Amino acid sequence: MAAALTRPPPGTVQCFGRKKTAVAVSYCKPGRGLIKVNGVPIELIRPEMLRLKAFEPILLAGRSRFKDIDMRIRVRGGGKTSQIYAIRQAIAKALVAYYQKYVDEASKKEVKDIFARYDRTLLVADPRRCEPKKFGGRGARARFQKSYR
């Protein structure tokens, strides 16, 4: 219990990203540009299409903004695609929070505007969830066929 309440060390920022049931928590601190997901470098994510999706915030903001910081991301829950979307949101939110706390407000606003213009879900979670199945049919909305004779 005490470990859960400890504050992160000075110079770090902790942010999370969510998509459906996937949750990614990113720890951002001064460093030399390393980004690791569950202990593995982000460059090794497979398949290729999902890796490109995870790289979006890095490519949008520019590698130069990431060269002085290290990010460690832990992701759990959901499927592969949901995890990637949670990771990209965690990266984007952590960069914005880091710039707000340790750099300056102007560059934070610039980065935030770049992300918001490209895709709002980089900064804001998608509220859609799976609708539960109901009786009288095979799914949430589909009904069994009705017969009058």
Swiss-Prot record:
Record Pfam families: Ribosomal_S9
Family in the record: Belongs to the universal ribosomal protein uS9 family.
Keyword Zinc-finger: no
Gene Ontology molecular function, alphabetical: RNA binding; structural constituent of ribosome
Annotated coiled-coil segments of the chain: none
PANTHER family in the cross-refs: RIBOSOMAL PROTEIN S16, RIBOSOMAL PROTEIN S9
A GO term from the CC aspect: cytosolic small ribosomal subunit
Subcellular location: Cytoplasm
Single Gene Ontology BP annotation: maturation of SSU-rRNA from tricistronic rRNA transcript (SSU-rRNA, 5.8S rRNA, LSU-rRNA)
Keywords: Cytoplasm, Ribonucleoprotein, Ribosomal protein
PROSITE patterns in alphabetical order: RIBOSOMAL_S9
Protein's UniProt keywords contain Ribosomal protein: yes
Protein name: Small ribosomal subunit protein uS9
